Amino acid sequence: MRFTSSRAGGAVERTTRLLAILSCAGALVASGCDKSVGPFEVLPPLEPSSLEPTAGSWRMILLTGPSQIAVAAPAAVTSAAYVAELDAVKLSQAHLTSTQRNAIAYWGGGGVLRWNQIVRELVARYNLPPAPKDEGGYPVPDAENPFGDPAFPFANPVYAARAYSYVSAAQYDALKSAWYWKFQYNRLSPAKNDNAITALMPVTDLPSYPSEEAVISGVTVEMLRTLFPAAVEEITLKAAEQRNAALWSGKATASDLAAGLALGKSVAAVFLARAAGDGMRTAGGSPVLWKALADSATARGEIAWISRDIPARPPMLPLFGQVRAWNMTPADIVAERPPPPPSTSSQQMKDETAEVKRTVEHLTNEQLAIAQKWNDGAGTYSPPGHWNDVTLEYVRDAKMSEVRAARVFALLNMAMHDAGVGCWEAKFHYFNPRPSQLDPSIKTQIGLPNFPSYTSGHSTFSAAAAAVLSYLFPSGADSFAGMRDEAGISRLYGGIHYRADIEAGKAHGDRIATYTLNFAHNDGAP
């Protein structure tokens, strides 16, 4: 599988593979067995440029405040219980296996970054549209039977955008709460409290109680159990490995980990309660709805979109435009809807269709490479995943703390989720046909998405992402703008979008991003 990532100075391509699951015998704690996910690029040991002592006061997304979920005071560092915990760390370090040392190195680059990689791999694995049934029609993935055929979920672009946003937002609130309690109790790491313990991960003066590794693992495993239930075994093992690595490395004791795990799971429960009622369960609609959408377009005198799959496939999540956004109300979504596309009977539409045909018939090698680079179709981490991949490099190079990194991904992914909601609301409001529907002689260069054309999802996602990243990393603004434009035009090169789709999508994504940026400007983070 070919994934791509861009960075200032040009595109950087790298190959990643689907999750490789290695079997292991015995419990992870006992054996240190790595039921591995990856492979991923090596992350340098995390040595944050700031401890972010005020992060506990930064604005929450869903929690009412940093102390909403109580964390009991830890035992004193002079207590017999804590001394016994330190002895347990020393004992574990005296018998470390090479597998355990590899786990320490694997997680030492930061849990937020590592889990972001894992989520992208899960999206890629499950981003597979169901195959048609022998008798015709298509089966629907069932959350109640995630191991069935087809497996649940079908991690299409908007499912992926929602998944990235829930994981990132939950991690961010959980870590802000953890930071609040860390600086309430100020218990230093084991390696700081006992010089007989070797620091195998970079150790700072950041308080260790509750453990940020355990907080991240706890909140993430609970979110992913719901979002990717068929992967529950490997997700659970990776989360346990992260916590164990923190103990083996001398960064956390058992009570640091227990407190962090409980906090993370409690925060996840808040986010999962929201997810259960955000409208996603009914986003697929029904045949009656699908017909009504087509009839509405026809009644306006337009040619209605139809599926080009054989047999015709139901439209992809036509009610996703009604799924709850993070920083926009339903009224905001409607108010920001782009103006109508060119009429299907207009000269402009004829001209734009002709431009698509002319472009794909005279495609240069560079244009084809751009179309493929930004394809992000079935079997990949999706357009939102592409921007997460880009973002990881900037976060890594900035040496951000876990809570600062979580803020970046939360802002990015909330904006892209909201962009997906807004884009899908427009797509199914206008129900505009694809270029190859109006002119079947157009030969697309990439897969044809199974939903209406206007506006371009790539353009909307990319504009929202570029706007947020330009705020977070101002020095990269020109690069982000270039990637936004390249992602948009790639859809014309691929033969699947008109120019109007692209330009309207970019403008729409820019407007949607302002809602998340308003949150960011007032969240208290320096």
What name fits each language-model region?
Residues 1-14:
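N-terminal secretory signal peptides that target proteins for export/translocation
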Residues 16-21:
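Sec-dependent signal peptide recognition
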Residues 29-32:
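C-terminal motif of bacterial Sec signal peptides marking the signal peptidase cleavage site
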Residues 34-526:
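Acidic/polar surface patches and capping/hinge elements
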